[in-house]
Amino acid sequence: IEEEVAAAAAVGSGGXHHHHLFHHKXPEHAHRHKIEEEVA
């Protein structure tokens, strides 16, 4: 899972990011991850 987070962060707001959110199926995690990318 950690590797997927790093990969999604590297891709940014690309398609892999959306796949990452659907993969976890966790609203809280998805929202948190999205905010982290916007701040970064």
From Swiss-Prot:
Biased composition range(s): Low complexity: 1-11
Superkingdom, natural source: Eukaryota
Disulfide bridges in this chain: none
Biased amino acid composition, Basic and acidic residues: 25-40
Region (Disordered): 1-40
Family to which this protein belongs: To tomato abscisic stress ripening proteins.
Miscellaneous note of the record: On the 2D-gel the determined pI of this unknown protein is: 6.0, its MW is: 21.7 kDa.
Official protein name in the record: Unknown protein from spot 237 of 2D-PAGE of etiolated coleoptile
Species for this entry: Zea mays (Maize)
